[in-house]
Amino acid sequence: WKTVRFGIEGAYPPFSWTEADGSLKGFDVDMANALCKEMQVKCKIVAQDWDGIIPSLLARKYDAIIAAMSITEERKKKVDFTGKYALIPNKFIAKKGAGLDFDNLDGQKIAVQRATTHDKYLTDNYGDKVEIVRYGSFDEAYLDLANGRVAAVLGDASALEEGVLNKAGGEAYEFVGPSLTDPKWFGEGFGIAVRKQDKDLTKKLDAAILSLREKGVYQEIAAKYFNYDVYGQ
C-alpha cells in the first residue's frame, strides 16, 4: 500500500464536516491523516454520503471507511473492521421542557439518520409505538427539531452536542431519557471498515491505531474535539 484512500461522510461534526471551500475537517479526518503518517503511506480523503458509504467501499471508490461507523454484526457480513477507535454513548435530545415520558412515547415523532444503529434501535424497540422520521443527514433532523416537526432526535451524544447544544441557540435544548450503549444495537464502538479481501490493510490499520495511542498522538487529536475520553473502556 503506497496510498490509502479513506471514505468520510463530511456531514457529521465533530467527526467530520465540510468547510466552505469544500475541504473536510474533523476527528475522522485528523485520524485518517495520522494513521497514514504512521503507516508511511500517502493519504487521500474522499467525501461520501452516508447512504452509499459501504457500497462505494465495495466498488473500490476508496480503501477504508473512517466515518464514526459502529462495528455491528450486520455490517460485519459485508465488511471487515479494525478494533474500535472510539466509543460514544447514544442519547436523545429535545427542546427544554418538552416533558417527554420515556415510559410512554406513544405517537411521538422521533428523528434518526437513515440506516444507522439509531434507526435500527428505534425500529426494534419503539417501532410500533412511535413515528420514526428518517433523514439523509443529521442537519436535516436538527432543522425539523427546531421547527417542532419532531419531538426528539436520537444520535451519538458527541454529534448532538456539536450539532445542537454547542451551536447558537443550543441552550434551548437538552439531553433527555436514557443513555444507550447496548452492544446488541450499538456495536462495539466505532471501527474502520475495510473490504474483506484486504486483510493486510486491516492489520496495518490496527497496528497504527495502537501505535498512535501508545505515542499519545491519539489523545492529542481527541483533545481537540472532545472533553472526555472518547476511546471509552
Language-model features: locations:
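Periplasmic-binding protein-like
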Residues: 86-94, 165-206, 226-233
